[in-house]
A protein has these predicted regions:
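Anionic-ligand binding patches
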Residues: 2-4, 11-199
Length: 199
């Protein structure tokens, strides 16, 4: 089954393709589709549905969308739904992943409560009357310094996953999938997609 993936993020596509194994994911840009929806929801679920519906309205075919982010207790839940753009408004430009996680560490200097969680909402949009959403989390804390591990992407070098007992960037690829917010949500979604196909 071909699924459009409502994203422009190659890393996310690679990870989601692996997690869903057997389902071909197609990014809009791979078919020359301009896709830049206004993610103006208040929650991860809102934004996943907004992205899925926006792409469905263009392709009229099954769409998968994910919205995820990092919520840090001591920062009032920030960066939250703005994780991907963290610090960019103040900087007036796009920031690299390293610049974002270094900014996060700077903003947490002197803070002892380092509890945080990654949240992932995945929406499967089959039609305007068949929409499914799954949300999962992975709990942990923000490290004091970045790890030298080279696994993962984004904030993985500074996120300690409680279940895994280590920094996410240090986890082997298969292990990350076991503990990550996206891995948990994708496993449930994979089962749901398989059920839908057998209806």
């Amino acid at each position: 089954m071909k699924l459009y993936f409502a994203s422009g993020n190659d890393h996310k596509k690679t990870e989601m393709s692996r997690l869903l194994g057997g389902f071909e994911l197609t990014l809009p840009k791979e078919e020359g589709i301009y896709f830049d929806p206004d993610e103006n929801g208040e929650t991860f679920i809102d934004n996943a549905v907004i992205k899925a519906k926006a792409l469905y309205d263009i392709v009229h075919a099954p769409v998968l969308a994910d919205d995820s982010g990092l919520c840090v207790d001591a920062l009032g839940g920030k960066p939250g739904i703005h994780t991907a753009r963290y610090g960019e408004e103040d900087a007036g430009r796009k920031l690299s992943a390293e610049e974002k996680y270094m900014l996060l560490l700077k903003n947490m200097e002197g803070i002892t409560n380092r509890r945080a969680e990654f949240v992932c909402a995945i929406c499967l949009y089959l039609s305007p009357t068949r929409i499914y959403v799954i949300q999962e989390t992975s709990e942990g804390s923000i490290a004091l310094t970045p790890s030298n591990g080279n696994g993962g992407f984004g904030y993985d070098p500074v996120f300690y996953n409680n279940e895994a007992g280590m920094i996410v960037a240090e986890l082997p690829e298969g292990k990350k999938d076991l503990y990550s917010h996206r891995g948990k949500a994708a496993r449930i979604m994979k089962t749901l997609i398989e059920k839908e196909l057998n209806r």
